[in-house]
Amino acid sequence: MLSRSSTTTTTPSSVRSKVLAIAASAALLAGASVASSAVAAPAPATVPAAPVALAAPEVPGRGSTALNLFQWTWSSVAAECTSTIGPAGFAYVQVSPPQEHIQGTSWWTSYQPVSYRLESKLGTRAEFKNMVDTCRAAGVGIIADAVINHMTGADAGSGTGTGGSAFGVDYFPGLYDGSSFNDCRSNISNYGDRYQVQNCRLVSLQDLRTGSNAVRDRIAGYLNDLLSLGVAGFRMDASKHIPAADLEAIKSRLTNPNVFWVHEVIGSAGEPIQPSEYLGSGDSHEFQYARNLKGYMDGSIAGIRGITNGLLPSDRAGVFVDNHDTERDGHGTMNYQWGQKYLLGNVFMLAYPYGWPTVYSGYKFTDRDAGVPGSTATRVPDASCSNTAVWTCMQRKPEIKGMVKFRNAVTGTAVTNWWDDGSNHIAFGRGAKGYVTINNSASAVTRTYQTSLPAGEYTDLVSATGARYTVDSSGRFTATVPQYGALALAVGSSTPVDPGEPGTNRTTVFYRTSWSTTNIHYRVGSGAWTTAPGRAMTPACTGYVKLDLDLGSATTATAAFNNGSGTWDNNGSRDYTLTGAVARVDSGQVSATSPCP
């Protein structure tokens, strides 16, 4: 059996087998290396000269914010581009590897190629092309995850891929044979040894001889095929395991040698291979940013301005809160299971001017190797955001959609008017275009904020409730930010963001209260409950607060109310059933009349 060392220093998307080497992972997370077995090495590799800058491409009016739709089928991505991603203002969608791969239900089969045919469990070539065209029509470019370091594992033996292609241990008909792979046939055991990392097998995966012109031509042919279909850029999987010079040589063979690349290079202190040496052919994902972000969100965010210290230059760094590897493999990042703190991490990433951000959206899991529920060996079911038990659909969260709009509105501005309370409440402006405040504490906070915004009335982009705030002639406004909540104002934010998935049924909830802060904790139909304390309600008329609920195709919502500080009204443990166009809750009774003129 093979072991899997899932660590911050070693593991790209492709490293997946059935046994977890827990001890090795712990050692590497601490910065140590697994003991090396002797591997004969040629002369030491040279580090390339100073790289040529290739900044992340900006899409006019959309900036460079990307969305990673992990294990979404091409048909599902196409539909989502039209309904949500394009209207929300995303510039790009990163999709999972499109090439043919080994059969199996686990997600990591997508990272074990057997050919470069576009016939994967996520869809056919025709479906891929339709996705690219549909998303482009919605203003969204496709970034394809390119797996070019290796083919499937030597331990896989022979078999048939998802598109019907036969393959052997080191034979991939019409593509590669034994001469196409590096001479080192053992697994990497020492990440302090550059030769091993870039020439030996990554957990038995057949390591391509990328220094060979024949192999370079084959890889370039695959990428050029994707470019011919309209792909806008590539995430280069496992770049750390390919010499930077080889990648530059491959890119020079492309029909568009200036196409955008972002490298997966998981750097760690003391290792010989670092993200900076790959900047000659593209940007690099900055994994340390995500680790730093988790550290601040798990402790105090007052010092979060220092999150970029020692990291790549902003115009060369791709950033994320998590990705499909780190959410599973203990890389020290947050994931969807962090609830509101995870959303606040995304709010900060989208508000702060460092790097180009990617929002991650995948599916829920308890087994790190498990594929999407309902997957077969050759097909993944289409994504459905109405199935909240499976899909996370972060791109539909009001916090995410609102902050994508915020980021697009404040492009080109620096941080101004920084304020923090020395603990877990921060606020800062983006010049005269925007202002955001984040409360990473368990208590609601009311204060007056100093901004550089022009005087006027602004709609909060985060809460999606339509809450409006007046900035006076001195740039000040007063607001209550709920526990583990945020608020964002931007010039032009005169229309509230649509709260969640579009629907046909809508209920305006009025609640009578004397609380200074009121939240509604609810679920629509038989769906999932909101994360406590729920959504903040806004003043309606004397004695009442209100909130509009989008019920989608459902006709009822179940709810309880709270003040954000532990006091609840759950109707004597029975909760409230809300239905109709208006639901007025007063002293334990629900009626259908509005209390406000």
Question: Could you say what each language-model-derived stretch is?
Answer:
Residues 1-44:
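Secretory targeting and sorting signals
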